């Protein structure tokens, strides 16, 4: 089980990313637009830098929903490989079966 503080930190980052998503996208659009002047572009870059660091979606970590494990998380299920295997062995995931060839 992951530390509760680490899980809480990721939840906080997700909330911040949602809150600043539109503003961040507007600024990135201005920066990448070829028709904007250099002054406008530079002002947008400075505004983007003043936003909270944790508001960037890149800083979020995929974590297992049950254990909070940060590594080996399967996106399709939102669970770590260990919990997916346990659930599959109990038959709790429809359509998923152990491979044999």
From Swiss-Prot:
GO BP, one annotated term: translation
HAMAP family associated with the record: Ribosomal_uS14_1 (MF_00537)
GO cellular component: cytoplasm; small ribosomal subunit
Subunit-structure text: Part of the 30S ribosomal subunit. Contacts proteins S3 and S10.
Classification via PROSITE patterns: RIBOSOMAL_S14 (PS00527)
Source taxonomy: Bacteria, Pseudomonadati, Pseudomonadota, Gammaproteobacteria, Pasteurellales
Function, as annotated: Binds 16S rRNA, required for the assembly of 30S particles and may also be responsible for determining the conformation of the 16S rRNA at the A site.
Keywords: Ribonucleoprotein, Ribosomal protein, RNA-binding, rRNA-binding
Name used for this protein in its record: Small ribosomal subunit protein uS14
